[in-house]
């Protein structure tokens, strides 16, 4: 029996709701999608709950689920994945945080949680922090530049805990929070104290940085604080190949996703021009996926632009991103050959563009196979048509479904 290559494409934050600017259509409905439409006659579509109905997924928990790992068992917090994706080498017991370069006033009140989002000087600021803040109370501190305004912070040493609260207030106009222990332990208390010392030291370094003085002179907001959240102890995950028997690779420019994929043992590629934002080079990502499909059984292609547009409330940009993803799908199918692969297209969660945040809505999902199946006979691929389809699954079902339709699944039982 022929075994097919597997291509999984995730448009981050794909799912949506009717949008007033689109006369009640969703962005997926409004988008022109000729390549996807061409696949429908040999496809099943439907809805996926990344975690379970009504649960609002993070991008971390949803991807774990989609890759076949129950987040209730394996999730330890986002910080470790962000750090791995940003290039950190972690060892058991390290505590990692995800963070934002942000702008605060002299009273540490947050003015901009993302310091304007685009931060070309991020590498310079990370280098300066690593040179000037190396250790606090015998605990080693390391900073790693992530995508755009994002940064990861890793603590290494004895007697530290991830059971501490965030310093990120999550809203502008609020003061940077004091980290507090989340359990009654010496380790949690010690770690919270270290984080609070770190917050003040980071502000002192960044507020006097020549980089930020230049930004102010150029009319830009200074990146003068790092807001921390998502503390996580590093605990190694099983490799993707160990439970799927697949040789796997991933294309992504987003630190979190790269971190998860690296931890799962996938070969992670970030092509030149891939940014993890709206301005990403879609063609470069398509070419990378095509090359990886030559040598791998499974290729995962992650595109962040849909989610970035949603969080910023950019309706037209989300529609354009979907249309560009459709071209990516067409390019890959034309080059690899529609008879040689199965293709799944979905989102890791819904981010309604008028809400600007993740929601617990189910996400539309499409599965194309190159051989005769009972297709769903739908006119389009969108949230409304998906309700007519045959698929009604959880994220945890995705990997098994892909193994089955690629003729790679093993029988369960005698």
UniProtKB/Swiss-Prot annotation:
EC assignment: 5.4.2.12
Membrane-spanning residues: none
Top-level taxon in the UniProt lineage: Archaea
Alphabetized GO MF terms: metal ion binding; phosphoglycerate mutase activity
BP GO terms, sorted: glycolytic process
Family per record: Belongs to the BPG-independent phosphoglycerate mutase family. A-PGAM subfamily.
Described purpose of this protein according to its UniProt entry: Catalyzes the interconversion of 2-phosphoglycerate and 3-phosphoglycerate.
Protein name as catalogued: 2,3-bisphosphoglycerate-independent phosphoglycerate mutase
Classification lineage: Archaea, Thermoproteota, Thermoprotei, Sulfolobales, Sulfolobaceae
GN (gene name): apgM
